Amino acid sequence: MHIAIAGNIGSCKTTLTKMLAAHYGWTPKFESVDYNPYLADFYDDMERWSFNLQVYFLNKRFKDVVDISKLDEVIIQDRTIYEDARIFAPNLHGMGLMSTRDFENYSDLFDLMMSLVNPPDLLIYLRSSIPNLIGQIQKRGREYEKSIRIDYITGLNERYEHWIKDYKHNLLILDVDRIKFENRPEDFQEVIDKIDAELFGLFPNE
């Protein structure tokens, strides 16, 4: 089984991935950012490095999905392949930070990849406001994120909402402005109840 967590930068995807993996005994699949050879350069010069970064992410994410499909265990994935193609690349193109030529090339590659893999059994989307995202980004203090522009985060958030509205597969939306699962046990239990309802047909606690 493949469970995937989607959400903007700073929406606590990795935190929830770790907590759910520990609770259910699932195997976590984390987004690798520490060894990305393009990330720091991208945040310094988005237009120059946007295509390189997105192709790098797409390649890694596709490999992850293929690997997950071969496993019998339950995998919970931190970020999805959809977000690269439906959120980040279109946002860069819309901001004039990726050329139309590069964007079309990238999109064709994504479409080919998606014809070869299945969607997650459940997608968990972490919905968040901009102030909450900025607060989380500042709180974790990653050096390469210090130069992220607020208009970049805002553009991503708008595209996330459009994408989720049209998503056609199994979906659970969590409002992380309200549900503070990291710090409040009762909120984490609410998340568990909702997931159990989606996966096992159990009614969540009201």
What are the residue ranges of the model-derived segments?
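P-loop (Walker A) phosphate-binding loop of NTP-binding proteins
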Residues: 8
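Conserved substrate/cofactor phosphate-moiety recognition/catalytic segment
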Residues: 22-60
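Hydrophobic anchor at the beta1->P-loop junction of P-loop NTPases
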Residues: 5
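A basic- and aromatic-enriched beta-loop-alpha substructure that forms the phosphate/nucleotide-
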Residues: 61-101
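NTP-dependent small-molecule kinase module
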Residues: 134-206
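A glycine- and Lys/Arg-enriched "phosphate-lid" helix/loop adjacent to the NTP-binding pocket
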Residues: 86-159
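Post-Walker A alpha-helix
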Residues: 16-17
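Conserved lysine of the Walker
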Residues: 13
